[in-house]
């Protein structure tokens, strides 16, 4: 019998060829660098912006983004970020929450119901990367759908 190669379309080169636009909300430059390095080491073209406050987040929402990654911020909570996204022209922009220190797995459903796309742990690099690719694929699909409707 012949063998069948099964390939996950999330890992295709098409996602890597287009620029990935990340808005990273974190008060730590090291985490920002980790995320960028993880993607660039997998041959992604990355345009990322790091910020940690409400005012800059509001300004940046006027620009096109693929995914928001939320860690910790000076004066911004993830709930505020979700509300601002819903009220922007990018209502379907996925927000990934970096696993909070006090996070319990029993809270997962509550975060998802509030509008968080997923909760990922940057310390688990492979899982983080695959979760980010899922969010990126959804974002690109929704962007294409929106362009067709306009």
Where are the language model's segments positioned?
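Non-catalytic signal-transmission and effector/linker regions of two-component phosphorelay proteins
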Residues: 1-40, 140-150
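Conserved phosphotransfer microenvironments
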Residues: 32, 52-92, 99-108
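Short hydrophobic/Thr-rich beta-strand motif most characteristic of the beta2 strand and flanking loop
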Residues: 44-53
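Residues at the ends of beta-strands that form strand-to-helix hinge/output surfaces
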Residues: 120-121
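Receiver (REC) domain switch/output surface
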Residues: 124-142
């Amino acid at each position: 019998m012949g063998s069948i190669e099964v390939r996950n379309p999330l890992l295709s080169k098409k996602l890597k060829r287009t620029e990935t636009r990340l808005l990273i909300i974190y008060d730590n430059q090291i985490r920002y660098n980790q995320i960028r390095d993880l993607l660039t080491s997998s041959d992604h073209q990355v345009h990322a912006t790091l910020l940690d406050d409400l005012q800059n987040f509001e300004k940046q929402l006027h620009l096109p983004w693929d995914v928001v990654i939320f860690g910790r911020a000076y004066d911004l909570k993830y709930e505020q970020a979700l509300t601002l996204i819903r009220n922007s022209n990018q209502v379907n922009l996925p927000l990934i929450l970096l696993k909070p220190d006090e996070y319990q797995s029993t809270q997962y459903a509550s975060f998802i119901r509030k509008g968080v796309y997923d909760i990922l742990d940057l310390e688990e690099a492979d899982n983080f990367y695959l979760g980010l690719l899922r969010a990126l694929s959804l974002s690109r699909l929704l962007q294409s759908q929106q362009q067709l409707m306009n």
